[in-house]
């Protein structure tokens, strides 16, 4: 197995409990993420492009562990935990992206409410957590040796 550095990461952990948001969670997240990317462009222009970072929202309490492979498709909880993940070439960019993302999703509107809403309860203050360098697996080896011992040579020594 092998690992490679993919960049630096900053996360934000928060909960959503508003029943109006939970009823439309998927569309709220899609709109919210689009607004996050738009706001990043509005703030940073061409100095940070979409190719400079990876942004993910994990939803624990729905499919945070298995993602699209989750067999239980219906949301049956009264709250979910969102983890906003920003990964970039530098810690500074990752933290900037996470900070913008937190603010945008915190106040992402829904049709049932007018004016400014707060839809995300952040667990920590400051809300962003710098994780430092992050890695992913990049190699898996499959070997079929002729002899099961050939990959693990044994050397015997006589010690007096």
Each PLM stretch: what is its role?
Residues 2-160:
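C-terminal non-catalytic interaction/assembly regions of soluble proteins
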